[in-house]
């Protein structure tokens, strides 16, 4: 898909179709179209095609970035069925030129996303170009250089998000830990500024990553610890992302019910998001040093599977009582967080589809933010709102911390109560964060929006690419504050 900024007024631009935006359901200004609207009972909601005049009338609820994304997604999905190549539209400017143009591109590319590699009949579209006039929707003037930055940023962010979706949507037969390692290596080959290191099970044993290794015991596919890194010449901060990469989770001996096992290919969403983030960071050439530590494994059943009642000694030296083998992601993250802290980060963020409790509490569309530093949590939350991803803060408290105490080890991998499960999982991870990094750490539970078995907003069925846009947006904010 191409996005072209054109200096001409909208009427002077040649294209196969035109987008006409309707704000606040205000149809009074459309005198010529009055009869056409009445004939089609159109009241300014949704979309209306005028095939004779080659126009698509499109609701734009506001100039908020999310509404821009939703409108452009609707535009693409409506027009992709037609035999056209180009569309023209006015510029849509909200509070920020860069963000507005980025949102426009994101809406189109999210609308165009499909995971159809296993379909025998694939639907293709001839639509290949969006031509954006410098004539602004409300007659305002804007900086063209900022518009170009926005178009580029939107394309990079959307492509990185869709890259993440492809990883999450891929089937478990194909997508093993070795495949994740291969994708990480290919990512480094495609971008000379990204370095990739892959570590095998012998390295994990040497590093005493026993919790990580235990999860992998019953799988025929060996685990991999993946380290991706990017470093700008004038890096302002060192940021480390840790991603849960369960390429499939059966629950282990604490076997999931059949219905719950469906969609567990998506348990690699945290690692996939981290890969999408570093891809975007490198393409945007952000002045940062960014590392991604990914724990890739399966959690399967077998005669050599780890068991409830086991006690594991983690890389941090913290002993863990296993009371449920389906609480495996936190075991992998515990050792990966330990490894990540050796990199001495200024900011440490882990991402995981960690708990069903998070989905029960927040719904399918919202990720949870947790940590010890309220200012950091609030900054991230406010930044995430601008990215288009939904988040909320879940606060730690000492009473929930009591629930993960163990009588035979330093900590239990599940709580003694089923209530507050998202927070007790976060508190478990906090047990492995060293004192000097307590205030530099954020835990993101992306279990809801990482994968949904329905389309919503501009997200298609399946993977949502959760985590990519909100984290990259926060990194951009960090750099803005550093100036």
Curated annotation (Swiss-Prot):
Binds 2 manganese ions per subunit. The keyword Hydrolase applies. Mn(2+) 1 binds at residues 249, 326, 328. InterPro entries: Leucine_aapep/pepB (IPR011356), Macro_dom-like (IPR043472), Peptidase_M17_C (IPR000819), Peptidase_M17_leu_NH2_pept (IPR023042). It catalyses: Release of an N-terminal amino acid, Xaa-|-Yaa-, in which Xaa is preferably Leu, but may be other amino acids including Pro although not Arg or Lys, and Yaa may be Pro. Amino acid amides and methyl esters are also readily hydrolyzed, but rates on arylamides are exceedingly low; Release of an N-terminal amino acid, preferentially leucine, but not glutamic or aspartic acids. Mn(2+) 2 binds at residues 244, 249, 267, 328. GO terms for cellular component: cytoplasm. GO terms for biological process: proteolysis. NCBIfam families: PRK00913.3-3. PANTHER family: CYTOSOL AMINOPEPTIDASE, LEUCINE AMINOPEPTIDASE-RELATED. Belongs to the peptidase M17 family. This is Probable cytosol aminopeptidase. It comes from Campylobacter jejuni subsp. jejuni serotype O:2 (strain ATCC 700819 / NCTC 11168).
């Amino acid at each position: 898909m191409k996005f072209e900024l054109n200096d001409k007024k909208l009427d002077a631009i040649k294209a196969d179709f035109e987008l006409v935006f309707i704000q606040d359901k205000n149809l009074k200004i459309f005198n010529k179209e009055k009869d056409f609207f009445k004939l089609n009972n159109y009241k300014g909601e949704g979309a209306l095609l005028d095939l004779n005049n080659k126009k698509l009338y499109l609701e734009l609820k506001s100039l908020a970035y999310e509404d821009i994304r939703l409108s452009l997604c609707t535009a693409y999905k409506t027009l992709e069925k037609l035999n056209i190549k180009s569309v023209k539209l006015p510029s849509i400017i909200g509070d920020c030129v860069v963000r507005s143009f980025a949102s426009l591109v994101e809406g189109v590319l999210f609308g165009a996303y499909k995971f159809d590699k296993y379909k025998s009949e694939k639907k293709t579209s001839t639509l290949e170009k969006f031509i954006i006039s410098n004539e602004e929707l409300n007659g305002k003037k804007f900086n063209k250089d900022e518009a170009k930055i926005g178009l580029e940023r939107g394309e990079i962010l959307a492509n990185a998000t869709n890259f993440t979706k492809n990883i999450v949507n891929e089937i478990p037969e194909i997508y093993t830990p070795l495949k994740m390692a291969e994708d990480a290596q290919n990512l480094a080959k495609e971008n000379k500024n990204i370095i990739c290191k892959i570590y095998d099970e012998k390295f994990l044993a040497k590093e005493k990553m026993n919790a990580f290794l235990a999860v992998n015991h019953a799988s025929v596919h060996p685990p991999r610890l993946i380290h991706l890194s990017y470093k700008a010449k004038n890096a302002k901060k060192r940021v480390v992302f840790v991603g849960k990469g369960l390429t499939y989770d059966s629950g282990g001996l604490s076997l999931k019910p059949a219905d719950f096992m469906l969609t567990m290919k998506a348990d690699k969403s945290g690692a996939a998001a981290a890969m999408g983030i570093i891809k975007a960071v490198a393409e945007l050439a952000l002045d940062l040093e960014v590392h991604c530590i990914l724990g890739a494994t399966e959690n399967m059943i077998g005669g050599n599977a780890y068991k409830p009642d086991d006690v594991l000694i983690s890389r941090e030296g913290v002993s863990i009582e296993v009371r449920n083998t389906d609480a495996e992601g936190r075991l992998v993250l515990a050792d990966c967080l330990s490894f990540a802290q050796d990199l001495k980060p200024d900011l440490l963020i882990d991402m995981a589809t960690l708990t069903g409790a998070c989905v029960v509490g927040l719904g399918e569309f919202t990720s949870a933010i947790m940590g010890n530093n309220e200012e950091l949590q609030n900054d991230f939350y406010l930044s995430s709102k601008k990215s288009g991803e939904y988040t909320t803060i879940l606060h730690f408290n000492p009473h929930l911390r009591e629930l993960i105490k163990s009588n035979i080890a330093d900590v239990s991998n599940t709580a003694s109560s089923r209530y507050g499960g998202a927070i007790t999982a976060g508190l478990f991870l906090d047990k492995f964060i060293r004192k000097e990094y307590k205030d530099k750490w954020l835990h993101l539970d992306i279990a809801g929006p990482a994968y949904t078995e329905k389309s919503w907003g501009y997200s298609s069925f399946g993977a949502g690419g959760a985590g990519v846009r909100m984290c990259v947006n926060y990194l951009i904010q960090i750099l803005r504050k550093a100036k």
